[in-house]
């Protein structure tokens, strides 16, 4: 029996206004390459990923300056929202493909974490899963339209959702289409799958897999990338 293909989908059509930069955050430089280049390379270099699709905004003026079309990737038009971009990315996938959706602004993703997530393929208990980290801080709920604390949330069982997020492509396509048609707030792929009634697994991931959102995230991501490349270099020597 042939193993299902794993296709990575990177929604990269966002503007990233919170970064307050002169360009979308995925095109900011980090350790000599753009954030998007680091992210694409991390997925291209993983031995269990068969294909990489990148969804970019129409009229993107930065993508073609990087020579990324020379890499073995496919490029599709992004949409207005993240869910639209992901949907455009998976429309061409085959019935048995699995979609591995990963944020463009998470360049520090760990190879071992990806492998652990991909081990869910073939599981009879869940439909797919996501990388996540358990909440460590005390969580407060505030009253609506105020900064007054309503109560303290029990953090037991609370996790920070990360990416990649892995699901059978056709099930994810239907879940996204149904969610969008019904006006559901789709903040990530797992939320669409949850709405569709599927069981989604949590796979513990590295806290280094940060999403670059604010300027202060850049030096932290740079530190994590240097650690990652140093570890890869040491591994290659041994």
From Swiss-Prot:
Function: Catalyzes the formation of 4-diphosphocytidyl-2-C-methyl-D-erythritol from CTP and 2-C-methyl-D-erythritol 4-phosphate (MEP).
Coiled coil: none
MF GO annotations: 2-C-methyl-D-erythritol 4-phosphate cytidylyltransferase activity
Similarity comment: Belongs to the IspD/TarI cytidylyltransferase family. IspD subfamily.
Pfam families (alphabetical): IspD (PF01128)
Protein name: 2-C-methyl-D-erythritol 4-phosphate cytidylyltransferase
Keyword annotations: Isoprene biosynthesis, Nucleotidyltransferase, Transferase
Signal peptide boundaries: none
EC numbers for this chain: 2.7.7.60
Site (Transition state stabilizer): 18, 25
Gene3D superfamilies named among the record's database cross-references: Spore Coat Polysaccharide Biosynthesis Protein SpsA, Chain A
Catalytic activity of the protein: 2-C-methyl-D-erythritol 4-phosphate + CTP + H(+) = 4-CDP-2-C-methyl-D-erythritol + diphosphate
Pathway membership: Isoprenoid biosynthesis; isopentenyl diphosphate biosynthesis via DXP pathway; isopentenyl diphosphate from 1-deoxy-D-xylulose 5-phosphate: step 2/6
PANTHER family tied to this protein: 2-C-METHYL-D-ERYTHRITOL 4-PHOSPHATE CYTIDYLYLTRANSFERASE, CHLOROPLASTIC
